[in-house]
Structures are given as C-alpha cells and as structure tokens.
Amino acid sequence: MAIILVRAASPGLSAADSISHQGTLQCSTLLKTKRPAARRWMPCSLLGLHPWEAGRPSPAVYSSLAVNPAGEAVVSSEQKVYDVVLKQAALLKRQLRTPVLDARPQDMDMPRNGLKEAYDRCGEICEEYAKTFYLGTMLMTEERRRAIWAIYVWCRRTDELVDGPNANYITPTALDRWEKRLEDLFTGRPYDMLDAALSDTISRFPIDIQPFRDMIEGMRSDLRKTRYNNFDELYMYCYYVAGTVGLMSVPVMGIATESKATTESVYSAALALGIANQLTNILRDVGEDARRGRIYLPQDELAQAGLSDEDIFKGVVTNRWRNFMKRQIKRARMFFEEAERGVTELSQASRWPVWASLLLYRQILDEIEANDYNNFTKRAYVGKGKKLLALPVAYGKSLLLPCSLRNGQT
C-alpha cells in the first residue's frame, strides 16, 4: 500500500546531492547521517459506482473518458493505469508460483554486515521523516520491515529531486541518469549503500521496475507542467508520484493467506490509497504550491466553479471556493473508501502501518474543513494528540478479518 510521500521540500535529504546539474554522481548526504466470481473488478470510476458500492451511481467526481481535439474518444488515464495494475497483479501471481526469494542479483557483492548497515540507515531515515509509519513497520517481520524502509527511502530521494533544496538544478538529463541508476540497482549494481538496500530487497520480493520508472516520469512531469486541464491529467500525475508507491509495496506487504480477494483488487486498492494521499497533499498545499507558481487543481473544474488561477493567487476564501473544495474533498474521501477494503486483505502483520497512514491522512481533510477551507494561508495538520489516538484505532482495524471473508466473497 502507499507509503506517505509528502510533496514538500525537506532540508537535508536530497537525492539531488547524488545527481548534480553537471551530471556527475556524488555521495548522497543520506549516507552521512472479493467480489462474486462473475464480476470483474475495475476501478470504481470506470464502473461509474461509488467505491465498493454496486447499484448506486456516484457523483461525477471521477473522469473515465478523455476526448481529443477532433472529438474522438481516447483511453482515459484511469484505464491506462488500470492496465498497469493488471500487469502488476499478473506478474506477482506468476512470480509467486516460481519463487526466487532467496536469490541475489548476480553482480551484487556486498558483505552481510554492509547490507545490515544499509538497511539500518534506511530505517533511521524512515523514522526521522515518517515517525508514525515507522512505528507501524515495527510490527512487520524483519525482512518485510527492512524492505519497506528501502522502498520508502528510494521514493523519498526521488521526490527530493524536484522538491528538494537543489531542485532548481535538476534537468531532464539528470532524471535520465537517475533512471539509469535505477536500472543498475535492479540488475545488482547499486551505486551507494541506500541503493544496495533496495537492490537486495528486489532480489527477495517479486517487485517490478515499472512503478519505479513511472515515479521518475512523474518527476519529469513536475519539471515541465504547472497546470492540469482536467482530472484525467491530474489522476495520471497522482498515479506517477504516489499511486506507484502502492504498486511497489504490495509484493512486500503480502496478501493474507486467508484472503478471498483477487490480486488485482488488492493492487487497485493500494493504488487508490496512493491517489487519495496525493489528492490530500494537493488540497492541503494549495497556498504553498501557488506561491511556487503551481496549481495542482483541475482547470476545467475551477472554471465550472467560477474560479480562476487569479483567485488561487489572491488566496481569498469565498463561498465559491468553499463549494469547490467540498467537491474536491468528497472525491479524495471516495478514494480513501476504495482503499479501505484492500487494507484488510493484506498480511495481518503489514496492516497496522497502512491503516495508520490511511486514518491520519484522511484526518487532514477534516482539518481543512475545520479551517473553513482556508488552505491558502493555513496548513492543515493532524496534532500529536490525534495521532496518538489514531494508532490504537489503526491497530484494532488491523486485527479484523479480510473484507472478502466478512462479506462472504469467494
């Protein structure tokens, strides 16, 4: 499921330190410190239904069909991403039939104590920047816990390329080099100790490179794009930068042996959590992004609400803005609802951190409402007290049977 990836600069944690604008690789600062069988599962927006609720039309808050300038129907972003989900699910099922979890990349030669140090450093970074999620990972088996740390760190380093302190120096060429480095670590040739942790993880779990490549593509998008014409475009961006994390994580989290859900439905729910988290980031950071000249809101929906870019830059909360935000929050919550069912299908030891992520991120939407939809000058956040209260709730939910069993699915 999706790891929390906050789209904001974090001082002292920059992957750009390892890819300079001249293109030379340098040492990273991080090193120093079920449904009935007859029904095919598809994303709720493609079915035109409220998440997990048959027979009831949803509000038009998802896009499922795009139209080109000639007026011809084209494949929507959701369908493109769903095709990726199907491929990832098929790959997982195929690789689990022929497990290679004890294999190591042929070219990788690193002492065992070196790998331990690499994983420990990943854990330190996760603890520093995602404390609640880190706490939840401590309930996982050691192998899964370390693997999730390694994935988290790679995602964070990638995110820092365009959001970190050196973001102004990052070019498309630098991202191409980062992708080449990704390909190297997937073939057992890591550049540094943090890469080595992920390379070892890849050798132990059936993880595919495609979601990692797609995340880098999202960073490329951030370099060239500051507006999104409609939700179809925004959905693809959210998939690239956050939905991919869910697809990376499912093979590590594992699916409960007693689950009756299809593999593709679990992947799709993981994707939904990533999308929900990113939409929440966007709604929380409207003012901050506007000050950087960026608007991550569907332009057509702004226009329909009688709003423009100028209204965003002025940052005045009006009734039009409140009504617009209510609709955006409703859509984000629908993705959270879609994600909830998939969390229950994960291996029990993996559920707590995912539930914690889901519950805490969803509360950010509540805080935006509590701030009277002022996300221009107020940054919604969940206080420490509410975080502490959410942890036992998340733990309790992690003990429940998979929804596919409770609902009698086969």
From Swiss-Prot:
<dbReference type="InterPro" id="IPR002060">
    <property type="entry name" value="Squ/phyt_synthse"/>
</dbReference>
<keyword id="KW-0150">Chloroplast</keyword>
<comment type="subunit">
    <text>Monomer.</text>
</comment>
<feature type="transit peptide" description="Chloroplast">
    <location>
        <begin position="1"/>
        <end position="62"/>
    </location>
</feature>
<dbReference type="InterPro" id="IPR019845">
    <property type="entry name" value="Squalene/phytoene_synthase_CS"/>
</dbReference>
<dbReference type="GO" id="GO:0004311">
    <property type="term" value="F:geranylgeranyl diphosphate synthase activity"/>
</dbReference>
<comment type="function">
    <text>Catalyzes the conversion of geranylgeranyl diphosphate to phytoene. Mediates the first committed step in carotenoid biosynthesis.</text>
</comment>
<dbReference type="GO" id="GO:0046905">
    <property type="term" value="F:15-cis-phytoene synthase activity"/>
</dbReference>
<keyword id="KW-0414">Isoprene biosynthesis</keyword>
<dbReference type="GO" id="GO:0051996">
    <property type="term" value="F:squalene synthase [NAD(P)H] activity"/>
</dbReference>
<keyword id="KW-0125">Carotenoid biosynthesis</keyword>
<keyword id="KW-0934">Plastid</keyword>
<comment type="similarity">
    <text>Belongs to the phytoene/squalene synthase family.</text>
</comment>
<dbReference type="GO" id="GO:0016117">
    <property type="term" value="P:carotenoid biosynthetic process"/>
</dbReference>
<comment type="pathway">
    <text>Carotenoid biosynthesis; phytoene biosynthesis; all-trans-phytoene from geranylgeranyl diphosphate: step 1/1.</text>
</comment>
<protein>
    <recommendedName>
        <fullName>Phytoene synthase 1, chloroplastic</fullName>
        <ecNumber>2.5.1.32</ecNumber>
    </recommendedName>
</protein>
<dbReference type="GO" id="GO:0010287">
    <property type="term" value="C:plastoglobule"/>
</dbReference>
<dbReference type="InterPro" id="IPR033904">
    <property type="entry name" value="Trans_IPPS_HH"/>
</dbReference>
<keyword id="KW-0809">Transit peptide</keyword>
<dbReference type="Pfam" id="PF00494">
    <property type="entry name" value="SQS_PSY"/>
</dbReference>
<keyword id="KW-0808">Transferase</keyword>
<dbReference type="InterPro" id="IPR044843">
    <property type="entry name" value="Trans_IPPS_bact-type"/>
</dbReference>
<dbReference type="InterPro" id="IPR008949">
    <property type="entry name" value="Isoprenoid_synthase_dom_sf"/>
</dbReference>
